[in-house]
């Protein structure tokens, strides 16, 4: 089946059949981008990536200089029992993404609390999820797919890169 039909045809077929239908493993490989232990649906693979895969567990030195204080503060916030949704706000180029990369390095190399060892940091590039949407419903479908993915993978930390494009949307001056 996978050799005869294109991915677009299979995408259409699965969307017609329904979400809860079992998909044979050979067909499923076409629909998921397999990362270490996490399969990102192909629909989301152009918007999401796993930041932990950027680093190797054997790395002894982090190539991200500084940001130690900010990274430790982020770890403290994420360790709290409640109200642990952190948002990094700052001017462009001050190192918001570097803080999250440093956190991913600490998780990958094991330089963090035990409860963080199995976490994956998934980066959502919000500009690309909004780009190319012809109507509002199209963007909503993409966000719904994202929410389903996150519900199926509770061991994820979602980092929304360029979140100001959503927060500032619709603002008037």
Predicted ranges, named:
Residues 1-130, 139-172:
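Histone-fold recognition with a strong bias for associated Lys/Arg-rich disordered tails
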């Amino acid at each position: 089946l996978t050799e005869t039909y294109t991915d677009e045809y299979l995408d259409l077929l699965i969307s017609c059949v329904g979400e809860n239908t079992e998909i044979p493993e050979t067909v499923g490989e076409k629909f998921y981008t397999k990362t270490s232990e996490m399969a990102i649906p192909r629909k989301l693979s152009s918007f999401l990536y796993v930041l932990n895969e950027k680093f190797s567990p054997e790395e002894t030195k982090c190539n991200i200089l500084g940001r130690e204080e900010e990274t430790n503060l982020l770890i403290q916030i994420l360790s709290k029992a409640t109200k642990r949704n952190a948002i990094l706000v700052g001017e462009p180029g001050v190192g918001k993404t570097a803080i999250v990369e440093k956190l991913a390095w600490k998780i990958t190399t094991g330089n963090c609390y035990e409860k963080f060892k199995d976490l994956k940091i998934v980066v959502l590039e919000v500009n690309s999820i909004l780009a190319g949407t012809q109507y509002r419903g199209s963007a909503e479908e993409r966000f719904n797919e994202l929410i389903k993915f996150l519900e199926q993978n509770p061991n994820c930390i979602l980092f929304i890169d360029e979140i100001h494009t959503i927060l500032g949307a619709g603002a008037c001056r």
